[in-house]
Design a protein with these regions (language model features):
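Catalytic beta-strand-to-alpha-helix segment of the class III nucleotidyl cyclase homology domain
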Residues: 1-75
């Protein structure tokens, strides 16, 4: 399973952090085995690429304000 989001990250020693990393992890939490979920933000960056997505609706992500549209990559 994987969760995709795009945004600013911070290099913290040998690791990365920041809100974008946190959001990607929360998006991944909702994915099942062999599924790839993407935030609406990540989806918006690949529209027109030929990748196919289905909308899963909006979801509240733990520790993140607001409601986030979530998409599933299907091909």
């Amino acid at each position: 399973r994987a969760g995709l989001h795009t945004g600013e990250c911070e290099l913290i020693g040998d690791d990365v952090g920041g809100m974008a990393v946190h959001i990607a992890a929360r998006v991944a939490d909702g994915a099942g085995a062999s599924e790839i979920h993407a935030s609406g933000t990540a989806y918006g960056t690949v529209v027109g690429s030929g990748l196919r997505f289905t909308a899963l609706g909006s979801r509240e992500l733990k520790g993140v304000p607001g409601s986030w549209p979530i998409m599933q990559l299907i091909g």
